[in-house]
Amino acid sequence: MKYLFKKIEPKWQAKWEEAKVFEAKDNSDKPKFYGLVEFPYPSGAGMHVGHIKAYSSLEVISRKRRMEGYNVLFPIGFDAFGLPTENYAVKTGTHPRIITDENIKRFSNQLKKVGFSFDWNRVIDTTDEDYYKWTQWIFLKMFEKGLVFRDRTLVNYCPHCKVVLSNEDSQGGKCDICHSDVVQKSKDVWYLRITQYADKLLEGLKDVDYPDNVKQQQIHWIGKSKGAFVNFDVDGIDEKLEIYTTRPDTLFGVTFMVIAPEHPIIDKYADKITNMDEITAYRNECAKKTEFERTQLVKDKTGVRIQGLEGINPVNGKKIPIYIADYVMMGYGTGAIMAVPAHDQRDYDFAKKFGIDIIEVIKGGDISKEAYTGDGEMVNSDFLNGYAKKKDSIERMLEELEKKGIGKAGVQYKMKDWAFNRQRYWGEPIPLIHCPNCGVVAVPENELPLRLPDVKDFEPGEDGQSPLAKIDSFVNCTCPKCGAAAKRETDTMPQWAGSSWYFLRYTDPHNANALADMDKLKYWMPVDWYNGGMEHVTRHMIYSRFWHHFLYDLGVVNTPEPYAKRSIQGLILGPDGDKMSKSKGNVVDPLDIVEEYGADTLRTYVLFMGDYGAATPWSENSVKGCKKFLDRVAAVSYTHLRAHETLAN
């Protein structure tokens, strides 16, 4: 007797839905279990086998917890704003709302066909006005608390998508969305001050059950370092160049400085620079390079000495040359660095190329061959000579810097403030107004949600402005403070916005008066177990932890951390062992498997295909093996049932 999945699975899936057996009960007397999976982006391609693996582990845990007497919340929703839908809308002329609704309907039917035990009464959609009202509300609270600011800066810009990208969305110099080359462009950018929460994000990792590699990735992403800010005078002008260094003890070995090509001191003192034509030509070349290209460690060292300006080493008074070089960025640190070529390989290579002095200040290597980056006894360093422990020499130098007023201890982070605006249509409108009298003003809370207007042209302007900028009825408004004619902000939020708090809305998805009721939050939060992909442990998880910490400080949520536990699933590779992609023709459609072998076979195979956290190639033979196993289970069950019937008769 075989497992008759085409008869059995639809029957029980219908009964589950009719009886609402997977709906969670708020404030139950039972112990609670909140299992969370990363809600999907409802693409036109629909569900893939990666979704099956991502959801199957907590699906099993959730069913087990229900059998153990827990009140289980296992929700699903859709992270539906984003560029792919908008690009498809531009291509086809179909409104993103229509595309999104169709994709969500198809995706929901697919999920139900696979038999997941989601609570379908709590489905959320980030493009729903009742949802993004609260995304906008959180943004306004951040604006009130000074966590939102605007700055004109060089940004990562995708010419194909016509959108500004954060550093996180343009790694490797490629657009995360379309994989086109990213260019640098000067634009006004809205930022969220995530760096103000850097220490809380680091401290919070001590209180959660995350895999070590997840914690380490987040620690590395935040990139906290302790060091010193030091001021270098510039000879002949009333100006100081501030640098940050983690090794202030090596100041006696500084033989040159490097500043970013965009550093304002260049234009400010252009009349004193005798090779301004050469400087300008080099700056123009740098402007053509992406941040990724500029900061690559393995590349030819380029730079130009600034003739007419010299720095002064603050600890020994020696004059040192100042260069501009592409590897120094204004967005990192102070836009200026001190160079110690004897003990930093990049500085060493630069010094060798340009014939700059190399002074050893730490014994232990052969600086005629390469930089020495290890520890050792301090030499050629005046009051530090003889110090052998790095910690002691740094502390002594900090004392000297602070005593003389030329520097102080400080902290820097690799993580930068979050670039938060996009010049596209299909995203949450940023609820701010530009008034000629009052400056930037918040949209009043009672006017939320600030709705997306209906448009026919979704294409961004050639000037890089959002499609919303073309709609006068949306742009032109009245200042809520002074009543003057004003203009709305026309940029929209990035796709990461809606996913930064969605786990809270699941606890109270139909609340019109708050993002969630505090009693329900106290019952359900924190999430007991969150499963997802390794690709989201930095951006999404750090962003959502940041928002949650902010809401906790605001008194809106009851826990500082949103997720008590995190697990990671590995990729499902194609049968050929390569990553699945349409271009390679190795994509496996999960619904084809459901149709041929059944949903239970598919989920059984995904759970037994190998180490859950490892990348594993798809095997059709193993799928067949799982179906044979279920056939044997069915045969035993049918035999057992017939025996019972015989005894009963």
PLM region spans:
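Conserved oxyanion/phosphate-binding beta-strand-loop segments in alpha/beta enzyme cores
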Residues: 1-36, 71-75, 102-105, 285-323, ...
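Alpha-helical recognition segments enriched in aromatics with Gly/Pro capping
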Residues: 309-315, 319-332, 361, 475-614
